[in-house]
């Protein structure tokens, strides 16, 4: 059954969302819910990313699915906030049916997931500044696509995978990354992924999942947790910077996303962006033309 187009499946998905919304809205500190995690991966087309039981859909069908899920939640919880979680294929793969347009128009805010193990780390290598600039680049890319300059941003996933960030550099990686984010216009929240390491008693996880936490699986804070605690007050006090430099431009189709691959971390645009960020100490703007 197709996860995005089959009427029975969509009915079941909508019902789950309605029931969750009905229960969660009773909690005094709950403000909304996210459909995730990276559900559009089931429609992915990129080599190496294609799901073994892929659910094929068109761009219009992806749009309909997003709207259906959003409406199910809003019907039950009108005052709640609703988000979607997208992996970065959405920003970089030309023929992905989920497009940047979807990310910047659906839900309460634009969410970004930043992982350096996929493309940035393999291209630039351990310790390269591109790794700590990558989350900010994604946020600037999201801003470039958005028709609303005031649309909120949420860096929903960012972490220090030990495949490219060794233990002795994890704390510095975290503080440098967070420093690059603090001045981002519209950024409302950052979620460091994740809270705790996965226990080695749990088998069959990818190796990097066992060491992503701010805490060990028994609750001991790791160096990056202690470093984060120290910088949080500064992060709260930092103000977004008005970016005056001329933006770096790229061309991509609003409706289909065709051309978005030029923004990939394997391309020249990202290299130019990182070089300028390192030279000036400020994140360059991006502009879609």
Where are the model-predicted features located?
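The substrate-binding groove and active-site-proximal loops of carbohydrate-active enzymes
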Residues: 2-12, 39, 51-62, 121-133, ...
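Core-facing hydrophobic residues within beta-strands of well-ordered domains
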Residues: 27-30, 107, 187
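Glycoside hydrolase catalytic-domain groove-lining segments
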Residues: 59-60, 75-163
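Histidine/acidic-residue-rich catalytic or RNA/ligand-binding cores of hydrolases
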Residues: 164-178, 202-209
């Amino acid at each position: 059954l197709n996860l995005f187009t089959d009427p029975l499946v969509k009915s079941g998905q909508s019902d789950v969302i309605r029931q969750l919304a009905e229960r969660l809205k009773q909690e005094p500190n709950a403000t909304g819910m996210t459909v995730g995690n990276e559900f559009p991966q089931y429609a992915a087309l990129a080599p190496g990313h294609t799901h073994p039981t892929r659910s094929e859909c068109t761009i219009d069908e992806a749009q309909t699915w997003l709207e259906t899920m959003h409406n199910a939640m809003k019907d039950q919880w009108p005052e709640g906030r609703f988000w979607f979680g997208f992996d970065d294929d959405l920003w970089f793969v030309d023929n992905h049916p989920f497009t940047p347009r979807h990310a910047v128009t659906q839900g309460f805010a634009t969410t970004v997931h930043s992982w350096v193990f996929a493309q940035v780390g393999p291209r630039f290598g351990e310790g390269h500044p591109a790794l700590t600039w990558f989350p900010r680049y994604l946020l600037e890319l999201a801003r470039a696509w958005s028709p609303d300059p005031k649309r909120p941003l949420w860096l929903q996933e960012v972490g220090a995978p030990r495949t490219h960030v060794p233990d002795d550099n994890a704390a510095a990686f975290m503080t440098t990354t967070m420093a690059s984010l603090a001045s981002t216009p519209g950024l409302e929240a950052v979620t460091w992924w994740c809270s705790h390491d996965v226990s080695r008693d749990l088998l069959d996880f990818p190796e990097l999942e066992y060491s992503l936490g701010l805490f060990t699986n028994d609750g001991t804070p790791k160096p990056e947790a202690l470093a984060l605690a120290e910088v949080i007050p500064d992060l709260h006090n930092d103000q977004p910077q008005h970016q005056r430099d001329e933006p770096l431009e790229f061309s991509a189709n609003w409706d289909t996303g065709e051309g978005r691959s030029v923004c990939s971390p394997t391309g020249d645009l990202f290299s130019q962006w990182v070089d300028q960020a390192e030279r000036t100490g400020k994140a360059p703007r991006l502009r879609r033309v």
